[in-house]
């Protein structure tokens, strides 16, 4: 008998109940007892198995992006960019690749309302012929901090107070007052875009700069942009409160119902590219994750479309156990030197091993749909059937060999060991440009949100003054309006 043929699956359900070992269960209502009253006998094996399974049916929730929903579909290339990359799934117009996509809130817990103000996660897993590519992004193009040493503190400052488990503005504003680089992300976080109407009506961004490499080995830095074909729609604070009070899973329901009705969500993929030789021509560091690239100088290039046309079959198997990792790239795409990206390559795989187990890549939703081979073996919950005798490399008894070399960036890196910030911080310019691009009513909502947060009674005069100074450096009128509402003068 093929040992993998009858692995647990609904495809092999029997018409009657069984234990996990396949033994028949003739009573699933009453426990085995001594007489009608009891006590209950420990020999009721199915009762013990049922309770023990129930006790363990949940896995640790994600430390970030815990609240989310997934859907399946395809990505189709619509424009030729083969001169920029040799990535197989981008090889030519018409090429299609199966995908699974997960949307989420970032800070809040599993089961929390999806209408709460938060950045939204936008992760896409491409099941390519040459391996999985995970584009793990958000609905805003920047992040709060550029160095991963601050990342755990960033998340803790955004999450609830560890003493009371209450989310409080004073904690957030206290921490980020030490990180002026966060101001640009706050220009999104306190803006309308962090109250999206649902997942279908929001943009997505790869956030980090990556690199595209063509078959000649020429590299370009790249940023990825997802644009919804149905447009961007956001809620007001009042609408968000109403929606969240009516249905805490409104965005999940909207995504599921839309696909079930044949109204398939669709996004267009665009990229921005930059020649590495041009990196030093800007007044900011293009590899700084707190910055966007100017579209007037680096215009959006159309690439393809993402269509979600299938709902997931099982929420636990295809959402809770779904694992993304920015380290999963394919030939033709490579990492940039972005400090935060470099550390996410490790951190994502590490958290999945903790959350799901060391063999999480064997789960069907995470496993590549192409052939794959290495000597990673065994471990808890190993599900592969392997009968080879050679589990080392190299060997004259095993014909397996290294893959052919594919192009990677050939840049020369040098410098001293150092712990320092980047030279071109320029923390306020882009935040100010974004603020000035809005209509007056949108500016007013942004100012109102700052006033509300800075009015937290535990926010000190010093912290208020620092933030008003940051806002004034971005846009003088913005800082003045917030200051006048709070009767505070900048001190920086």
From Swiss-Prot:
CDD domains: catalase_clade_1 (cd08154). Its EC number is 1.11.1.6. SMART domains: Catalase. It catalyses: 2 H2O2 = O2 + 2 H2O. The active site is at residues 65, 138. The keyword Transcription does not apply. GO terms for cellular component: cytoplasm; glyoxysome; peroxisome; plasma membrane. GO terms for molecular function: catalase activity; heme binding; metal ion binding. Its cofactor is heme. Heme binds at residue 348. Gene3D superfamilies: Catalase core domain (2.40.180.10). It is found in: Peroxisome; Glyoxysome. InterPro entries: Catalase (IPR018028), Catalase_AS (IPR024708), Catalase_clade1/3 (IPR024711), Catalase_core (IPR011614), Catalase_haem_BS (IPR002226), Catalase_immune_responsive (IPR010582), Catalase_sf (IPR020835). One of its GO terms (biological process) is response to hydrogen peroxide. Keywords: Glyoxysome, Heme, Hydrogen peroxide, Iron, Metal-binding, Oxidoreductase, Peroxidase, Peroxisome. It comes from the Eukaryota. Occurs in almost all aerobically respiring organisms and serves to protect cells from the toxic effects of hydrogen peroxide. Homotetramer. Belongs to the catalase family. This is Catalase isozyme 1.
């Amino acid at each position: 008998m093929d040992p993998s043929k009858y692995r647990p699956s609904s495809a092999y359900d029997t018409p009657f109940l069984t234990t996990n070992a396949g033994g028949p269960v003739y009573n699933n209502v009453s426990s085995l007892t001594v007489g009608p009253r009891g006590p209950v006998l420990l020999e009721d094996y199915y009762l013990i198995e049922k309770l023990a399974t129930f006790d363990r049916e949940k896995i640790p929730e994600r430390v970030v992006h815990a609240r989310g929903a997934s859907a399946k579909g395809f990505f189709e290339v619509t424009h030729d960019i083969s001169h920029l990359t040799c990535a197989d799934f981008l090889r030519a117009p018409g090429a299609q690749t199966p995908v699974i996509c997960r949307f989420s809130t970032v800070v809040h817990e599993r089961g929390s309302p999806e209408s709460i103000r938060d950045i939204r996660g936008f992760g896409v897993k491409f099941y390519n012929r040459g391996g999985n590519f995970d584009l793990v992004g958000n609905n805003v193009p920047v992040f709060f901090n550029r160095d991963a040493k601050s990342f755990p503190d960033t998340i803790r400052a955004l999450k609830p107070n560890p003493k009371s488990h209450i989310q409080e503005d004073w904690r957030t504003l206290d921490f980020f007052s030490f990180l002026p680089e966060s101001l640009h992300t706050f220009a999104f976080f306190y803006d309308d875009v962090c109250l999206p109407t649902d997942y279908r009506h929001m943009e997505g961004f790869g956030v980090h700069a990556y690199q595209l490499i063509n078959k000649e080995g020429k590299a370009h830095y790249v940023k990825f942009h997802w644009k919804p074909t149905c447009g961007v729609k956001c809620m007001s604070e009042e609408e968000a409160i109403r929606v969240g009070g009516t249905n805490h899973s409104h965005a999940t329901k909207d995504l599921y119902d839309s696909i079930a009705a044949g109204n398939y969500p669709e996004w267009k993929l665009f990229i921005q590219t930059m020649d590495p030789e041009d990196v030093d021509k800007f007044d900011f560091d293009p590899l700084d994750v707190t910055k966007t690239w100017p579209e007037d100088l680096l215009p959006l290039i159309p690439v393809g479309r993402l269509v979600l046309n299938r709902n997931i079959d099982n929420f636990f198997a295809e959402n809770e156990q779904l694992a993304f990792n920015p380290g999963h790239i394919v030939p033709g795409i490579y990492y940039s030197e972005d400090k935060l990206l470099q550390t996410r390559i490790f951190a994502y795989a590490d958290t999945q091993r903790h959350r799901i187990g060391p063999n999480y890549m064997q789960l069907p939703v995470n496993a590549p749909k192409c052939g794959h081979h290495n000597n990673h073996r065994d471990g808890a919950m190993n599900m592969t059937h392997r009968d080879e005798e050679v589990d080392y490399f190299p060997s004259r008894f095993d014909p397996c060999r290294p893959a052919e070399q594919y192009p990677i960036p050939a840049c020369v890196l040098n410098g001293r060991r150092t712990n320092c910030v980047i030279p071109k911080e320029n923390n306020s310019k882009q935040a100010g440009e974004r603020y000035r691009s809005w209509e007056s009513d949108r500016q007013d909502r942004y100012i109102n949100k700052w006033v509300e947060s800075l009015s937290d009674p535990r926010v000190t005069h010093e912290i208020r003054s620092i933030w008003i100074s940051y806002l004034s450096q971005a846009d003088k009128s913005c800082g003045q309006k917030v200051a006048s509402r709070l009767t505070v003068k900048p001190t920086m």
